[in-house]
Design a protein with these regions (language model features):
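Hydrophobic face of alpha-helices
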Residues: 9-12, 54, 69, 128
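Non-catalytic beta-strand/loop surface segments
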Residues: 1-7, 28, 41-47, 51, ...
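Short secondary-structure capping/junction motifs at helix and strand boundaries
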Residues: 8, 20-33
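Extreme N-terminal "head/tail" segments of very large remodeling/mechanoenzyme assemblies
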Residues: 31-36, 55
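Helix N-cap motif at beta-to-alpha junctions
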Residues: 3-6, 120-125
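A common structural junction motif
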Residues: 17-26, 133-143
């Protein structure tokens, strides 16, 4: 956001370009840096996984609150996209190939599968015309089924017990979580 029209136009350009024309589609090394890659730090060392998203998700998967939140969504919404971790499970991230990533990106990161919101005191027609000319008209309309399914109600309550890791130095005192959840409507 910006109150300055020139800055706002520049921000629109930067964000639209980043989403619709990312360099990751041209350079596999970006996928390896951001997603995951093998790493060997010493010639006779252990081969490990590394990558920005891989490491971020390892951190997210180590937090008890995140573990609880993920399991709540998986149990409450098993038939929907909400059952899955949007950032990826670190154990599964390493199975993602560059080609699979590109296929997913090309299918879902398309203007036909987006909502663009503009808000504020501006010339909306001028902004929409600029977006169309600079970005949107370069794409053919696609029919993309990205409907989010509604989870059917369960006939019986579900009880689930899950466990999470703690380090040897962490206390187990007050380290138990209890969560009672319900879905209110669609």
């Amino acid at each position: 956001a910006s109150r300055n029209d020139k800055d706002f136009r520049n921000l629109m350009d930067v964000y639209l370009d980043a989403v619709l024309n990312p360099n990751i589609g041209k350079e596999k090394k970006i996928f390896m840096q951001e997603g995951w890659h093998y790493e060997l730090t010493e010639p006779d060392g252990e081969l490990t996984y590394n990558g920005v998203v891989y490491n971020e998700m390892k951190g997210a998967f180590s937090s008890p609150e995140s573990v609880l939140d993920r399991h709540i969504k998986a149990v409450m919404f098993p038939d929907t996209c909400y059952a899955f971790e949007s950032g990826g499970d670190p154990e599964e991230i390493t199975a993602l190939t560059y080609e699979d990533y590109l296929a997913f990106y090309n299918k879902y990161y398309h203007p036909s599968n987006s909502y663009i919101y503009l808000y504020g005191d501006m010339d909306f027609a001028e902004k929409l015309e600029w977006m169309d000319k600079e970005y949107l008209e370069k794409y053919d309309r696609q029919e993309i089924d990205s409907e989010i399914q509604i989870q059917k109600a369960f006939e019986e309550p579900i009880e689930k017990e899950i466990f999470y890791s703690v380090s040897e130095t962490e206390s187990l005192e007050n380290a138990t979580y209890l969560s009672v959840n319900t879905s209110a409507g669609n």
